[in-house]
């Protein structure tokens, strides 16, 4: 069963800031596009198997069910709501 994937406005802002930094500060628009493509692909893949990535090492965050996926040089942090069959992307750092 597929889960719904939701991205918080904070995480969305994080993703756009990272892409803007790569495109405008590092002057590499291709790398920025690659980051956005990789983020879309990896985050979308969570819908089919959300538990495939581990909990964070921090015991407090792990107790909240915070997991992470590595996307290029960034981490996307997310939680799983089993009751609502949804995944919430909370940050992208």
Enumerate the language-model features and the residues they cover.
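Arg/Lys-rich, positively charged N-terminal/basic patches that mediate binding to nucleic acids
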Residues: 1-38
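Short aromatic/hydrophobic contact patches that present stacked aromatics
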Residues: 4, 68, 77
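Generic beta-structure capping elements
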Residues: 8-10, 49, 90-92
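Enriched for short, Lys/Arg-rich terminal
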Residues: 26, 71-93
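Short, hydrophobic secondary-structure boundary micro-motifs
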Residues: 34, 54-57, 87
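Short, charged/polar surface micro-motifs in flexible loops or helix N-caps
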Residues: 41-52, 75, 83-86
């Amino acid at each position: 069963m597929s889960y719904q994937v939701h991205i918080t406005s904070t995480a969305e802002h994080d993703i756009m800031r990272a892409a803007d930094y790569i495109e405008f500060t590092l002057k590499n628009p291709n790398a920025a596009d690659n980051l956005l493509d990789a983020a879309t692909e990896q985050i979308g893949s969570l819908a089919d198997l959300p538990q495939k990535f581990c909990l964070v090492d921090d015991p407090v965050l792990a107790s909240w069910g915070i997991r992470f996926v590595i996307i290029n040089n960034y981490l996307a942090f997310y939680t799983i709501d089993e009751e609502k069959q949804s995944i919430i992307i909370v940050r992208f750092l």
